[in-house]
C-alpha cells in the first residue's frame, strides 16, 4: 500500500512500479490521501517505509503507528535534525517530546546518513534514516495518558519537572 497526497504522483506510481518491477504491480494499492488523515487502508500494513516531507515527518510517523497496530517495523528518511530528535537518549540536548513518544511504540534507532548530494536539486539539509521496531506498550496505562504526561513534562523545559507537572493531576496542587 502506498499513501501519496499528490494526485499526479499517485497516478504515476503504478506505471513506475510496472516499469521497474512488473511482478509487483498486482500487489500495489495506491491511496491518494494525506497520511495524517488516513484511518483505514485496503490491507493492514506491517511495515512503514517512507521518504517523508520534513515538516510533517514526526506527526506522520506517530499517527500511522498509533492508527495501525499492524505496523511492526518502520524505516523512514527524515531531515537529519529530526532523526537526531527521534533517536535522542535521555539527558541529551535533543531529547524531547518526539524521542519519548516514538519510544512508546518501540525501539528507535538511527539507521544511517543520507547525504544531500544524492538528491537533485541538492537541498540545504542532510537526511537520516530512522528505524522503529514495535514493542508491546506498557501495561496499565493508555497512550493518551502517557502522551498527556509527556506534553506536560516537556511544555516548559526550563522549569523543574516538579513545577512543570504541578497542574497535570487535577486536584493535586503540587507534585511530590
At which residue positions do the language-model features occur?
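Catalytic cores of RNA-modifying enzymes
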Residues: 1-152
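C-terminal lobe and adjacent flexible extensions of AdoMet/dcAdoMet transferase-like proteins
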Residues: 134, 151-176
